[in-house]
Regions:
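DEDD superfamily 3′-5′ metal-dependent exonuclease/proofreading module
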Residues: 1-214
Length: 214
């Protein structure tokens, strides 16, 4: 598996200016307010991972440094992965609103390292899933923006032509056997993925983050 570069940004909410950067790649770390230094650092990685990278970090970077093309990177978002892999209880590294639990506020290096911990916990949780459930998640989610990067990293682009049948076989009587499942697969794969994750752990004990329910 290829190495992943983890990072975080501190953004001024008043003007969108990025004040500070933190990063971790293999054994190297970065903590700087210098944008050019940050850009040089992330060139080391093909896969970029941050907590809420899709809706926070990348949009902030694109606004602050619009001449840089971030599309060449494959993005992995631990915000979306966490409730998929840990639906049964509040994840211990996350606090209210699924922000990262760190020792210092507004320290992007600490947040980048916390993201790294979250990612490897997610990776370990995924690796112990039954193979059939891995294939269901890959087939359902690997072409969505929220999960595409993760499955590219895992080199898992499995796409089943009989996904409905595979879901029904794996979950059995835990889910309703009706034709609406095909519509959910086609139109709401992410929502269905989260629902299946909850069902898989006997959903009465699950805790779903508020942002997922929205």
């Amino acid at each position: 598996m290829e190495s992943v570069l983890f990072f975080d940004t501190e953004v001024d909410p008043k003007n969108g200016r990025i004040l500070d950067y933190g990063g971790s790649f293999e054994e190297k770390i970065l903590h700087t307010g210098d944008t050019n230094e940050f850009l040089k650092f992330i060139q080391k990685g093909k896969f970029l991972c941050a907590h809420n990278i899709l809706l926070h970090d990348i949009p902030a970077l694109q606004k602050f440094i619009p001449d840089v093309d971030f599309s060449k990177y494959t993005l992995i978002d631990t915000l979306h992965l966490s409730p998929l892999m840990f639906p049964q209880k509040p994840y211990h590294r996350l606090i209210k609103d699924d922000k990262l639990q760190t020792d210092q506020i507004n320290n992007p290096l600490n947040d980048a390292l916390a993201t790294k911990d979250v990612f490897y916990d997610v990776l370990a949780a995924f690796d112990i899933l039954p193979n059939s459930l891995k294939e269901i998640f890959a087939s359902l989610l690997s072409r969505t923006s929220q999960f595409e990067g993760f499955f590219k990293l895992k080199n898992n682009n499995y796409k089943s032509s009989k996904l409905k049948e595979e879901i029904l076989e794996f979950f059995g009587e835990k889910i309703c056997h009706n034709k609406e499942l095909e519509e959910l697969i086609d139109k709401s794969p992410v929502e269905l993925g989260y629902a299946l994750a909850i069902i898989n752990v006997n959903g009465s004990k699950s805790v779903t983050p508020p942002w997922v329910l929205k």
